[in-house]
Amino acid sequence: MTANLRVVPDEQSLGAAGADIVCDVVRAVPNAVITFATGQSGVPIYRALAERVERREIDFSRVRVFELDGYVGIPLADRRSLYGWLKRDVIVPLRIPEGDITRLRGEASDPVAACREYDRALDRAGGYDLAILGLGPNGHVAFNEPPADPQSDAHVLDVTEESVESAVRYWGSREQVPRRAVTTGLRRLIAAGRVLLVARGEAKRTALERALGSDADPMTPASFLNRSADVTFLTDLPMR
């Protein structure tokens, strides 16, 4: 299916629009299986959701969270771990019990086995009800880097140089950015009941335009999301 493109004027509007979609899913399925992107893309949405939780407009206490991706070999105690981001931006402010979180354990001694374990757990849960995703400057979603395989399950991968460069601001230098990662697979994201892809800032324009222009470009992994049954691309970029 062709993506539903929603363009909003500013960050606050983006947060509200994204939060509306998330709340619709959780109200319909209180124990929904949701995967949340870490990083800056989803922050306005998570802040808007936290405000609604504080006002008791929505309850995430039964939501089941599946970690989207992570770096290989980075301990959970490291604040730069993607689970650390998830906990600070989503788990704590939305009051989600940590017992309802399924990890994609990049810190495991055998990350390949951890990926298989994750997919088995996702199968038992019935797949994602909602996938909240950011868009990488090279078109990646989660750590599904180009060239991407739309039939992929959770896997270990080498991080591309483009993704290394975009992560330098969090790690301090190129040398410190991890070069290996684990990620859920595109096949699982495409099959999600609902997909919300967020593109913020001018640096994402080219990737967004390419994603909207195709449903089968391995060099733009996000383009495969057009095959999803219900996908919204949400952006604050004025479209030409």
Per-segment meaning from a language model:
Residues 1-34:
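N-terminal glycine-/serine-/threonine-rich phosphate-binding loop
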Residues 2, 6, 13-14, 73-240:
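Conserved phosphate- and dinucleotide-binding cores of soluble alpha/beta proteins
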Residues 20, 24, 47-54, 88, ...:
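Short, well-ordered alpha-helices that flank and scaffold nucleotide-derived cofactor binding pockets
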Residues 28-54:
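Glycine-rich N-terminal segment of FAD-binding domains in flavoprotein oxidoreductases
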Residues 36, 65-67, 197, 233:
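Structural beta-sheet core signal
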Residues 51, 57-58, 71:
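Glycine-rich, flexible N-terminal cofactor/catalytic loop recognition
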Residues 61-62, 128:
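Local beta-strand N-terminus motif with an aromatic residue
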